[in-house]
Regions:
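Short, surface-exposed "cap/lid" segments of acyl-processing enzymes
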Residues: 2-59
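The feature captures the conserved acid-bearing segment of alpha/beta-hydrolase catalytic domains
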Residues: 14-16, 115, 125-197
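Short hydrophobic segments within beta-strands
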Residues: 24-25, 94, 119, 169
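Short acidic, S/G/P-rich loop/turn micro-motifs used as interaction or catalytic elements
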Residues: 28-31, 59-60, 99-100, 123-126, ...
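Short low-complexity, flexible loop/linker segments enriched in glycine and/or proline
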Residues: 62, 66-71
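Serine-dependent carboxylesterase/thioesterase catalytic core
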Residues: 70-159
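Catalytic histidine neighborhood in serine/cysteine hydrolases
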Residues: 189-215
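Catalytic active-site module of serine/aspartate enzymes centered on a nucleophile-bearing elbow/loop
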Residues: 211-231
């Protein structure tokens, strides 16, 4: 397997003859270094013959703008890959937590993808995602919310997200998961082939074992949980 390379905001991992492409966006606190935070799951996908493009970013309040930024970065990297390896099938978009939301807000409405795998969809309000903000904002007399807001995000998904092929994955002990809200928004569309899958684990299950060891100790190396990560 080839080593990770960074091109702008995209971390790339490519087999010698890629059979397809994964475009990945991670979640808050993990997204700045996806090649580390999600190393295991992404390298396993590369071992299966898929090129990996992972967007590195620091989450902000304007999620609509960041969704466009990610989409444009992926498009540029995909063109460069196809110049080298030939035309590939449409990419599969893979997101974790906030990364799911950013994929769902992409300017093309999912049109340019083969489908979306949404791991642990998360769409909380800003004061829930950033606890300190919830304490300081009232004292400062300001109102701060993500753009689009959680409610508007779900409306935009129903109205503008056109990709029919979606797999919504939730983990049994994930207290941050809001997949039910996403499924409801997707099912309201005229055409939908979305499927749901529940697996054992929690919100950090998609993250690499190395990061999870630092957060959770030996618990992260439970063989059953490692198998879930590989699945």
């Amino acid at each position: 397997m080839q080593s990770w390379r960074q091109q702008g905001s995209i971390w790339q991992l490519r087999p010698r003859q890629p059979q397809g492409l994964i475009e990945f966006i991670g979640g808050s606190y993990l997204a700045a270094t996806p090649q580390v935070s999600y190393r295991r799951i992404l390298e396993d996908l590369c071992d299966a013959g898929l090129a990996i493009h992972a967007w590195a970013y620091v989450p902000g309040f304007d999620h609509q703008s960041q969704a466009k930024e990610a989409w444009m970065a992926f498009r540029q990297s995909r063109r460069q890959l196809e110049d080298r390896s030939g035309v590939l099938p449409p990419p599969l978009r893979l997101g974790h937590s906030l990364g799911c939301k950013l994929h769902l807000l992409a300017p093309d409405g999912g049109r340019g993808s083969h489908g979306l795998v949404a791991l642990s969809f998360n769409n909380f309000q800003a004061d829930r995602s950033i606890p300190l903000l919830g304490e300081l904002a009232p004292r400062l007399g300001v109102e701060t919310e993500f753009s689009p807001s959680p409610q508007e995000t779900l409306r935009l998904i129903t109205r503008h997200y056109i990709q029919e092929r979606n797999l919504v994955v939730r983990f049994g002990r994930d207290e941050l998961d809001q997949s039910d809200d996403l499924l409801e928004a997707l099912k309201k569309r005229g055409a939908d082939n979305t499927e749901a899958l529940q697996l054992p684990g929690d919100h950090l299950t998609p993250a690499s074992a190395g990061l999870r060891r630092s957060l959770l100790g030996a618990w992260a190396d439970d063989p059953k949980r490692v198998e879930v990560i590989r699945r």
